């Protein structure tokens, strides 16, 4: 069911945004719950089997380190997968815009689709779509490079690697290790990326919707003028004159 006032494509934007938001929260909750249960079980076993001996207690606790490390690694990998899914949501919706609004897409690379849409809009309507510049920069540069790193394991251009790691070094929620590893350390980073993409998508959809609405109004006015002309100047009946 489409929310009142939403286009089909806007409903898709909102629905998929909601699903991804829920996935971010749900996966984090599951791993955190699992980790807490492991820690509590480790503490219980250590207390029950150490007879108050401090060293024995900590030896038993340390035996669970591998389990905790595995849980942490799984959560880290899950965040990488989720980030790639979030970026895919963005690119998929851009392609949906091209189909839905019948936009002439001259992009030869996925990274050029947004620019192609913005140029097509300006050519057709003589106006620019004003998206938040920082969001567009993050989407086309930082987030795209991070997605490419996660998907391919490395970046082919040293320039891209330097750009990505410069961004990552000053971005909350990311940790860098060496010259080729970036870890998403918390969910806030995922939510920020998701909100960034949604903001761009809504901005584009609102612009096209407004223009289509204006075109519909002009069409209705034209129909009213024709109807009024017919009422005021009815055609002559055959046989008269």
Regions found by a protein language model. Give the residues of each.
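Flexible secondary-structure boundary motifs
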Residues: 80, 84, 88-187, 191-195, ...
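Extended intrinsically disordered or low-complexity regions, especially N/C-terminal cytosolic tails and loops
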Residues: 1-84, 134-138, 162-241
């Amino acid at each position: 069911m489409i929310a009142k006032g939403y286009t089909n494509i806007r409903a898709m934007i909102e629905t998929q945004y909601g699903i991804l938001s829920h996935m971010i929260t749900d996966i984090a909750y599951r791993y955190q719950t699992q980790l807490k249960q492991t820690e509590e079980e480790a503490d219980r076993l250590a207390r029950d089997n150490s007879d108050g001996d401090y060293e024995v207690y900590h030896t038993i606790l340390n035996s669970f380190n591998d389990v905790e490390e595995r849980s942490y690694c799984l959560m880290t990998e899950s965040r990488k997968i989720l980030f790639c899914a979030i970026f895919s949501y963005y690119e998929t919706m851009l392609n949906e815009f091209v189909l839905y609004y019948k936009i002439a897409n001259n992009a030869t690379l996925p990274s050029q689709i947004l620019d192609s849409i913005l140029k097509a809009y300006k050519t057709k309507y003589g106006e620019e779509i004003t998206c938040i510049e920082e969001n567009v920069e993050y989407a086309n540069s930082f987030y795209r490079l991070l997605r490419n790193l996660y998907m391919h394991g490395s970046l082919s251009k040293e320039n891209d690697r330097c750009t990505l790691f410069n961004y990552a070094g000053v971005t909350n929620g990311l940790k860098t290790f060496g010259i080729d590893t970036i870890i998403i350390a918390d969910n806030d980073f995922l939510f920020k990326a998701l909100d960034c993409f949604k903001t761009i998508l809504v901005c584009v959809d609102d612009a096209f919707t407004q223009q289509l609405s204006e075109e519909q109004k002009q069409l209705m006015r034209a129909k009213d003028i024709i109807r009024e002309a017919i009422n005021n100047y009815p055609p002559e009946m055959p046989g008269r004159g």
